[in-house]
């Protein structure tokens, strides 16, 4: 087990390109495998989660070649997957397990999905229920992993109102809908990332999006195309906050995905007074990209608009760090989904902020954070095996007077394998220590 030992620094500068978007990397493997023809991917995120997806489709008979961030997939078509010889172990990846369950629900063969200890605690009823309504047969461990999916079931399209704002559930049902008889429609509670919808269009699949309603009709084939994966805004967010809170900072992040369903973190930081600007905006493969420049600025506490929560759900832990450095109080509500991520991110972040000396009040669906000073020596933070917790508290070191130690950081490799390298490149001082 490894830990971060982070020494305080006060000046950041440079230009970075963070790794490829995790959500898009997952979906490119899945849809490329189900397409007819050869899909070539550049900018693929070589993290543990995305490699779990890649290996799962290799285990189902798909020929996939990869060299760093370049991947070539020889698609087998919608009905070309083969029964895996063993249960598919998706490690820590909730995206993999939930989206792949939608695909496997329609296959002719039986299958089983499992994951690590953390993933095995996360709720799967949210995908089991709509898939069962479509005609799937799925056994679970009281709504948790492992999932045993019975093959040979004929699926029927459904009209389904999402009970949680979840792109994973939405995508699971849409992927099952590719195989279903008739129309499948999803109605969203709130906007969530729309990479599945955009990529289906890229593969030539007709999908209708009308505000919060997404519909498709099963039975059409997917056709391969080239995919260029933009940099992940969830990874870029750590450096956006870093530059905002550092005493002196001026950094630029290049080629970052600014899909409208992902820019909640930008909107929130701007509301807090961040000195943040976008340039060189362009569109590649149906996704919007931009270069983002961030300079240090005194932030102010805000009430985070509830309509931005689902658009920044993965970035909220590092926004907590921004809030702890802001002048005044920041209030977050309507973020109950944070409690069922890799950890209970509301409680775990609150505990860590308390260790740093920051006053906070935990709410059922959020938190109140009073900006302050990180003044305590001998700080040791437990990450609870959650990559975003580890990286968020590493960023907090920029406002600390003393060394911070963050325990159990191996999980950073799931989403941002070169985080330490890039952080140190712009002036941070993070040592990865095997403990």
Curated annotation (Swiss-Prot):
Pathway, per record: Metabolic intermediate biosynthesis; chorismate biosynthesis; chorismate from D-erythrose 4-phosphate and phosphoenolpyruvate: step 6/7
Classification lineage: Bacteria, Pseudomonadati, Pseudomonadota, Gammaproteobacteria, Candidatus Pseudothioglobaceae
A Pfam family it matches: EPSP_synthase
Enzyme class: transferase
Family that this chain belongs to: Belongs to the EPSP synthase family.
Intracellular or extracellular location(s): Cytoplasm
PROSITE patterns for the chain: EPSP_SYNTHASE_1 (PS00104), EPSP_SYNTHASE_2 (PS00885)
Keywords attached to this entry: Amino-acid biosynthesis, Aromatic amino acid biosynthesis, Cytoplasm, Transferase
GO biological process, one term: chorismate biosynthetic process
EC number: 2.5.1.19
Official protein name in the record: 3-phosphoshikimate 1-carboxyvinyltransferase
Function: Catalyzes the transfer of the enolpyruvyl moiety of phosphoenolpyruvate (PEP) to the 5-hydroxyl of shikimate-3-phosphate (S3P) to produce enolpyruvyl shikimate-3-phosphate and inorganic phosphate.
UniProt main location, coarse: cytoplasm
Summary of subunit composition and partner proteins: Monomer.
Active site location: 314
The organism of origin for this protein: Ruthia magnifica subsp. Calyptogena magnifica
Residues in coiled coil: none
Catalytic activity: 3-phosphoshikimate + phosphoenolpyruvate = 5-O-(1-carboxyvinyl)-3-phosphoshikimate + phosphate
Annotated GO MF terms: 3-phosphoshikimate 1-carboxyvinyltransferase activity
Binding-site residues, 3-phosphoshikimate: 22-23, 27, 166, 168, 314, 341
PANTHER family on file: AROM/DEHYDROQUINATE SYNTHASE, PENTAFUNCTIONAL AROM POLYPEPTIDE
GO terms under cellular component: cytoplasm
Binding site for phosphoenolpyruvate: 22, 94, 122, 168, 345, 388
């Amino acid at each position: 087990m490894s830990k971060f030992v982070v020494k305080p620094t006060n000046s950041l500068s440079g230009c970075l390109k963070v790794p490829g978007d995790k959500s898009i990397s997952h979906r490119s493997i899945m849809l490329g495998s189900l397409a007819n023809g050869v899909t070539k991917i550049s900018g693929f995120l070589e993290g543990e989660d995305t490699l779990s997806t890649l290996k799962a489709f290799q285990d189902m008979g798909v020929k996939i070649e990869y060299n760093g961030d370049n991947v070539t997939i020889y698609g087998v078509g919608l009905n070309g997957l083969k029964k895996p010889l063993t249960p598919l172990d998706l490690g820590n990846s909730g995206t993999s397990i939930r989206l792949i369950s939608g695909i496997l629900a329609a296959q002719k063969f039986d299958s089983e999905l499992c994951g690590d200890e953390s993933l095995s605690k996360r709720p799967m009823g949210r995908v089991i229920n709509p898939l069962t309504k479509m005609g799937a047969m799925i056994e679970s461990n009281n709504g948790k992993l492992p999932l045993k999916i019975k093959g040979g079931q004929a699926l029927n399209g459904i009209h389904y109102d999402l009970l949680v704002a979840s792109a994973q559930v939405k995508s699971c049902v849409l992927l099952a809908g590719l195989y279903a008889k008739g129309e499948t429609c999803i109605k969203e509670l709130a906007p969530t990332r729309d990479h599945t919808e955009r990529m289906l269009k890229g593969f030539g699949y007709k999908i209708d999006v009308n505000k919060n309603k997404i519909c498709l009709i099963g039975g059409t084939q997917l056709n391969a195309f080239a995919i260029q994966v933009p940099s992940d805004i969830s990874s870029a967010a750590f450096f956006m906050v870093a530059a905002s809170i550092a005493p002196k900072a001026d950094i630029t992040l290049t080629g970052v995905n600014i899909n409208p369903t992902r820019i909640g973190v930008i909107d929130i930081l701007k509301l807090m007074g961040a000195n943040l600007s976008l340039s060189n905006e362009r569109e590649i493969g149906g996704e919007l990209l931009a270069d983002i420049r961030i300079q240090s600025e005194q932030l102010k506490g805000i009430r985070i608009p509830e309509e931005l929560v689902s658009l920044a759900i993965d970035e909220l832990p590092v926004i907590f760090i921004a809030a702890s450095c802001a002048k005044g109080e920041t209030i977050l509500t309507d973020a109950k989904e944070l409690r069922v991520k890799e950890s209970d991110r509301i409680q775990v972040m609150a505990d860590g902020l308390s260790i740093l000396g920051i006053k906070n009040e935990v709410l059922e669906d959020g938190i109140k954070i009073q900006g302050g000073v990180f003044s305590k020596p001998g700080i040791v933070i437990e990450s609870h095996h959650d990559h975003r917790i580890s990286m968020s508290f590493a960023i907090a070191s920029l406002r600390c007077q003393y060394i911070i130690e963050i325990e159990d950081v191996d999980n950073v490799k799931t989403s941002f394998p070169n985080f330490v390298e890039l952080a140190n490149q712009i002036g941070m001082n993070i040592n990865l220590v095997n403990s």
